[in-house]
């Protein structure tokens, strides 16, 4: 058994009931890690001996970020589309087809290089658990290979064959849904933990969404959903009805949508993706409204080449505080424990005996600095499964 002691922690965020406030903060604390798992959390003066030691030098220590919504397997970029949008052209989601064409044309090694590069980029910024979706292949072969590559990077992989109806099926959406529910799902399921649908105007309607999620669930996959990004729609309430783990975007919500999420009592998380609103110059979700209603909220990057090309959870925390009326503590919780809830994980997003030893040391005395000092590389060191990773 190998052990590691992280001591002289000025502020330790645990996300447990044992500490101070909703973040479970401990002051002047230490953490003992044994074989990649947290074995003990307590006062610095009572810290047990260990094989190795890391001195936090009075800095803040947090659980690793849990990014529960990302798209890392793709080819090309859409910088020109971004520039055009900033010049006043509205985003309608059609640009996804540009990435589909590039992804289909790319080699496995090219897709693999992008996925690994973005994963490493996220890790340097404190993300130790990341969900990765397919959705830029939209053929049986390309969706399966996208998920196979994603599975090399993360155990949290999501089949998103229902990202958009591809051009070759534009006049036959029902036929494409049959393909997604049949051969595509069969090819993708061995590499996926989740199934997702983009339930939105111009993509998939409620009937198609229900059919795909129901079939995916029957194949043993958990369910998640993109909904209510571009406008009001049936997605949020349908997601709650079907018991999906997370409804993502939630930008345009009715009172009935909020009531449905609140009534789910945490079983369906509202995952907010402020990077998408930043990059599309769109209205931000009203996180305050959701939190005040008792909805469980997660924050994620939506890292993708079209509408949110960022892998930085700290950037999304700053946006959430500045633009979505979240407190810094609420935003940090949403990016750690909230993300874990969106993935139905209890072993990450918190620091307590038995949890995975995924954590970060900040170059700051408090978690507040993540929102207070936007754009500054505050992650001093990241540990994943108790193993120090490359420094930023």
UniProtKB/Swiss-Prot annotation:
Gene3D superfamilies: Metal-dependent hydrolases, Urease, subunit C, domain 1. Its cofactor is Zn(2+); Fe(3+). GO terms for molecular function: imidazolonepropionase activity; iron ion binding; zinc ion binding. Keywords: Cytoplasm, Histidine metabolism, Hydrolase, Iron, Metal-binding, Zinc. Fe(3+) binds at residues 69, 71, 226, 302. It comes from the Bacteria. Its EC number is 3.5.2.7. Catalyzes the hydrolytic cleavage of the carbon-nitrogen bond in imidazolone-5-propanoate to yield N-formimidoyl-L-glutamate. It is the third step in the universal histidine degradation pathway. The keyword Cytoplasm applies. The gene is hutI. This is Imidazolonepropionase.
């Amino acid at each position: 058994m190998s052990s590691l002691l992280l001591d002289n922690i000025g502020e330790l965020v645990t996300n447990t009931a044992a500490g101070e406030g909703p973040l479970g903060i401990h002051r002047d604390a230490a953490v003992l890690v044994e074989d990649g798992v947290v074995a003990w959390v307590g006062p610095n003066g009572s810290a047990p001996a260990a094989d190795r030691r890391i001195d936090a030098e009075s800095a803040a220590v947090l659980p690793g970020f849990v990014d529960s919504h990302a798209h890392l397997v793709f080819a090309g970029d859409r910088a020109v589309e971004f520039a055009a949008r900033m010049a006043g052209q509205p985003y309608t989601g059609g640009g996804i087809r540009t990435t589909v064409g590039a992804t289909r044309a790319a080699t496995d090694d090219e897709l693999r290089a992008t996925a690994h590069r973005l994963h490493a980029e996220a890790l340097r910024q404190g993300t130790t658990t990341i969900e990765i979706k397919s959705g830029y292949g939209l053929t049986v072969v390309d969706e399966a290979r996208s998920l196979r590559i994603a599975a090399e990077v993360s155990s949290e992989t999501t089949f998103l064959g229902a990202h958009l109806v591809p051009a070759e099926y534009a006049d036959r959406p029902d036929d494409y849904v049959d393909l997604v529910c049949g051969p595509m799902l069969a090819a993708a399921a061995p590499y996926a933990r989740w199934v997702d649908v983009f339930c939105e105007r111009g993509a998939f309607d409620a009937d198609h969404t229900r059919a795909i999620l129901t079939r995916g669930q029957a194949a043993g996959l958990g369910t998640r959903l993109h909904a209510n990004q571009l406008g009001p729609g049936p997605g949020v309430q349908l997601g709650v009805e079907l018991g999906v783990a997370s409804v993502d975007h939630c930008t345009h919500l009715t009172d009935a949508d909020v009531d449905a999420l609140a009534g789910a009592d945490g079983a369906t998380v509202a995952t907010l993706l402020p990077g998408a609103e930043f990059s599309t110059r769109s209205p931000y979700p009203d996180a305050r409204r959701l939190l005040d209603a008792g909805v469980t909220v997660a924050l994620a990057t939506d890292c993708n080449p079209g509408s949110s090309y960022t892998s930085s959870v700290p950037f999304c925390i700053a946006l959430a505080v500045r633009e979505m009326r979240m407190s810094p503590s609420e935003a940090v919780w949403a990016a750690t424990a909230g993300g874990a809830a969106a993935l139905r994980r209890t072993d990450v997003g918190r620091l307590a005996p038995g949890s995975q030893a995924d954590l970060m040391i900040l170059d700051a005395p408090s978690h507040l600095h993540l929102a207070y000092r936007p754009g500054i590389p505050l992650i001093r060191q990241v540990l994943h499964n108790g193993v120090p990773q490359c420094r930023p």
